[in-house]
Amino acid sequence: MSGDEDNLIERITENRQAHFEPYGWHHWPEHPWLAYQFRRGLGETQEGGGTVSECLQAASRMFPGDKESWHREWMRVADRNQKRGLDEEQSGHVRTAMNCYLRAADYYRQAEFHLKPDDPRRLPTFSKMEACSHRFLALLTPPGEVLKSLMKANQFTHISLARLFPATNYLV
């Protein structure tokens, strides 16, 4: 990469309106790191980690550059998806519940992303993300498995891909 391309994420463009750049959608040109993280959220939609309309709905209620509105609006759409996931699971609509849990997990991740390390909302937001991820994994056929391991006195959660993709599916 040339020197100009090295820091595209941090570049504030002359065009102050939301627009497309060669590296993707630039929602808030004056706030490139928020625009970058929003672009990541849009990217998750192709794998079911959100919907374009929900991402745009959340963004439409955010104040450019305001990380409080960022957290609030992602929490709002995440909570709505988590509730719908619970309701759909109780009604026996497993696939819809799974979709809602997966979207909620990603939206909670978005909500947590710009919180300061000592923000008291960080752990509860992360815990909601983890709970939705676990519900999604539990509803897979066969169910996904969460493995917990200790490493340097910190606990990390790992997803066992062997449980998500049985060996007969990918080993020749």
Language model features with spans:
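An N-terminal hydrophobic leader/cap segment in hydrolases
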Residues: 40-57, 108-147
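Long, non-catalytic architectural segments outside compact domain cores
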Residues: 1-70
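N-terminal cap/lid segment of alpha/beta-hydrolase-fold proteins
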Residues: 74, 78-81, 123-167
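Amphipathic alpha-helical repeat scaffolds of TPR domains
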Residues: 36, 72-83, 102-111
